[in-house]
Structures are given as C-alpha cells and as structure tokens.
Design a protein with these regions (language model features):
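Transmembrane helical elements of multi-pass membrane transporters/channels
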Residues: 28-47, 149, 160, 183, ...
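Interfacial/gating helices of multi-pass transporter permease domains
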Residues: 28, 51-71, 137-142, 202-203, ...
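Short runs within selected transmembrane alpha-helices of multi-pass transporters and secretion channels
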Residues: 81, 150-168, 176-184, 205-218, ...
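Residue-level signal for short hydrophobic patches within transmembrane helices
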Residues: 19, 23-42, 46, 69-76, ...
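Short alpha-helical transmembrane segments in multi-pass integral membrane proteins
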Residues: 1-30, 88-155, 197-253, 309-376, ...
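Small-residue-rich hydrophobic transmembrane alpha-helices
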Residues: 60-120, 157-176, 283-347, 380-394, ...
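Structural signal for membrane-spanning alpha-helices in multi-pass inner-membrane proteins
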Residues: 122, 165, 191, 220-224, ...
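Helix-terminus/linker motif at the lipid-water interface of multi-pass membrane proteins
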Residues: 38, 42-61, 130-137, 193-200, ...
Length: 457
C-alpha cells in the first residue's frame, strides 16, 4: 500500500520527502527542527537563570555536578528513540502500513524495557557514581536528589522523544516543535512554582522537568489519536516478530551507545581543560555556548537527513539519497562560509557578550576557539549527515566506530597534546578528530551497496 501525501492543515503539515524538489523539501522539513534546537537552548539558559537566581550558586553547582550524568541518561534515551524512529521511517517510505504499526508496537515494548533497565541501574548506581566523580560533599545530596528524579522520569523522557521521532518519521516536524514549546513554557512555570513558591529546592527543578514532559506526551498521544492514526498499532501488531525486534533493538542500542560515547568523550576533554586554569575555562565555556548556537543549522539538517534517507531507503530511491546527500554537503559549505564571516567580524565581541568578562585571556581564547573552528563546519556537517545517513540505511557498526574514534582521539589529545600545547590543542582537538571521523564515514558511505549499487560485489 502506497502512502498518499497527507492533507495539509495548520496542525498536519507532513512534508513529502520522497517526491518533488529535494533541497526545498529538506529545508522546509528542517526548519521546525532548527527552531526546536534554538528553543531548547534558550530554555536551558532560562532554567539555569531561575535556579541560580532563586536558589544560589550552591544549587546551581549541584545541578552542574551531575551534568555529565544527565547528558549520558538523556543522550542514551534520545539515541534509543531516534533509532526506533529510523526503522519506522523506513516502513513509512516502503508504504507498508502493517509494518509501520508493528514497528510502533515494537518500539513501545522495547522502550518500556529499556527505560526500566536504565531506571533500575540508576537507582542502584547514581549515588556511588557521584561519589566516584568526586562531587563536593556540600552539594552531593542535592545533586543526587535532582538526578534520581530525572532517572525515575526516564520513561517519560523516552515517550516524549519517541512520539516526536515517530511524527518526524512520517514527515511531520512541525508538531514536535509545538510540543517542545509547550513543554518548555510549562517547565519554566513549574520551575518558578516549585522552586520559588513551594521551596522544593533543586528537586523541584527535576520534578518540573518530568511533569512538563509528561504533559507533552499526553498531548502528543492525543494528537496521534486525532490526526496521525497511521501510527496507532492494534493488538495484533504487538505480536513479537524476531527479525523486526532484533532490528529495532540493534538500531536503537547502536544510536544510544553512540550518544553515550560522545558524551563520555566530552567528559574526558573537559578533564584536560580543567587543568588550564579558571580564565581559560571561562573563555572556553563562553565559546562553547556560542558554538552550541552556531552549529544548530548543521545538527538540525543532520536530523532531517535521518528521516529523508530512511524514507527513501524504504521506498528504494537510491538516486534521491545520492542527490540529497550532495545537497546537504553543499549546505554545510554555505554554513561554514557564513560562520567564517561571522566569526571574523565579531568573535571577541560575542565572547564578551556571553561571558561578561573583560579579561584578555578569556576574550582572546574564546575568540580564537570560534575563529579556528569555523572553517571546519563544512567537515562537521558532512560528518553528522553521513553518520545519520548510514544509520538510516541499517549500518550500525561503522557509525558507532566513528564515535569510538572521537572518544579515543580526545584521550590522545588530553594525554599528549594539551599538556604541551595547552589551549591551542583544545581548540584543534575536535576539528582534527572530525576529519578522521569524516574520512572513515565517507569511505563507508562510498561503499554502501544501496547508494552505489555498481560497487556491490
């Protein structure tokens, strides 16, 4: 059964990624994802301001102390959800309604099991892990109180990301944006209520996060019942089909592990940076906050690429995959040129704006980080989109290998180069690693027998 384009309305804006102009469709599909990234970053800033201004530095430090653990939990959960959504997008592209509903049913089952395992492991190991990370005694209990609430809310976080991923899988990137905005606004309101009015402290921030995502899950499910019934499985679709369940499990674990390894690499690099002094850390922190905004066009397009390639892989359109990837690579070059111009004109001013510092060391190091990184945005865009494309076509090991390269590369820089070349080595660490990762991924892409069938042996 072939999927017909969905009738468009204000709340049902499915983008057809399998027919018509390629880049136009990709760009339209990507825009809500880009706004979602921007909104999430702005929300994170507001959330930090609320905790810092109402509860003070100690509470802010408590949340910061478990930041790496939070990223691991969230990254792994999002990775699992994205992996499951990739399989759903393939079924949608193939026009197989039954397969799509079986995929949704299997995703629900695997998601519940994975969430239970993560929650139980967290309940047993989070406190010892915080102690292992040498969390200061004065903030240890607050940090644990926050992260354990997040841990018990993993099932809600997973459901939230799975719902958004499944809607994107059928070409709807608009409604996930709506749900994200609602969740973020509600989270800010609940933060103020729980923290300022009820005096719940750091735990209030965790409860606010879980409740706001829970409300968004409920709204998303209601939307699916009303406007996206294609995603509603019936009882018969919960029958376990070993091949499908293995595909769902392996795809989700591959992406979950990839996110976790990337987060672990960031922790390793931060260890190297922490030995360079307070002013260097301040400059790097400001530069990374700016980087988080400037690389959004690349991460958003990579996310759109995942759905695009998955659908066209399912629809058996290798030519559209090739042409789409070419357009995405060119888009990355445009982003890089824009970043070079932007950083060459105002990098130091932007670092000063974000950091509020007038220290030359802070401003010079932060600006140098931005200027040196900008030309490599084209490489980063190629890396992200190629990795997502390979995962979308069923490749699991090779994209994961790229994350291992990143992790090992950061260990090498921390041990060998940062002690000798200090912050210059920090700046060059990721661009150099991006180049090695991209080479590995492009070789894998060029040898993919679906995209380049002539190379199939």
């Amino acid at each position: 059964m072939t999927q017909s384009p969905a009738k468009k309305s204000f709340f049902n804006r499915n983008v057809d990624l399998m027919n018509g102009p390629i880049f136009k469709s990709l760009f339209i599909f990507m825009l809500p994802i880009l706004v979602s990234c921007l909104f999430q970053q702005l929300y994170n800033t507001v959330d930090t301001m609320i905790v810092g201004n109402v509860l003070g530095d100690t509470a802010l430090a408590a949340i910061g102390a478990c930041g790496a653990i939070y990223e691991l939990l969230v990254g792994f959960g999002i990775g699992i959800g994205n992996g499951l959504a990739i399989v759903a997008a393939r079924a949608y592209g193939a026009g197989d309604d039954d397969q799509l509903k079986q995929t949704v049913a299997g995703s629900i089952v695997i998601g519940i099991i994975a969430s239970a395992v993560i929650t139980l492991a967290g309940a047993a190991g989070l406190h010892p892990l915080l102690e292992l990370l040498d969390t200061p005694a004065e903030i240890l209990e607050d940090a644990y109180g926050y992260i354990i609430i997040i841990d018990f809310g993993v099932i809600v976080m997973f459901a939230y990301n799975l719902c958004a991923g499944l809607l994107r899988a059928i070409g709807n990137s608009f409604m996930p944006l709506v749900f994200l905005i609602l969740s973020s606004v509600l989270n800010v309101i609940l933060d103020l209520w729980f923290i300022a009015a009820l005096g719940m402290g750091v735990a209030g921030a965790g409860v606010a996060t879980v409740i706001s995502q829970g409300v968004s899950v409920a709204l998303c499910i209601l939307y699916v019942f009303r406007s996206a019934r294609l995603l509603l499985p019936e009882k018969k679709h919960f029958h376990v089909e070993s091949r499908l369940y293995w595909e769902l499990f392996s795809q989700s674990i591959s992406m979950g592990l990839m996110s976790s390894i990337v987060s672990a690499g960031s922790v390793v690099l931060q260890y190297g940076i922490n030995g360079l002094g307070t002013l260097v850390i301040a400059g790097h922190t400001a530069a990374r906050k700016l980087f988080a905004f400037t690389d959004m066009p690349l991460t958003a397009m990579a996310s759109a690429c995942s759905t695009y390639v998955s659908q066209n892989y399912g629809a058996n359109h290798p030519d559209r995959v090739r042409r789409g990837m070419r357009d995405i690579y060119l888009y990355g070059v445009v982003v890089a040129v824009t970043a070079i111009l932007l950083m060459s004109m105002g990098a130091e001013w932007m670092v000063k704006l974000v950091s509020g510092s007038s220290e030359p060391v802070v401003l010079e190091n932060g600006a140098r980080y931005l200027v040196w990184n900008a030309p490599f945005y084209a490489v980063l865009g190629m890396l992200l989109s190629t990795r997502y494309a390979l995962q979308s076509m069923g490749e699991k090991v090779l994209p994961l290998l790229s994350s291992v390269i990143e992790f090992l590369g950061k260990i090498v820089f921390v041990l060998l180069f940062i002690p000798r070349f200090e912050y210059n080595a920090v700046i060059l660490c990721e661009p150099v690693i991006w180049c090695f990762m991209t080479i590995e991924l492009l070789i894998a892409y060029r040898h993919n027998s679906f995209v380049f069938p002539k190379m199939k042996k």
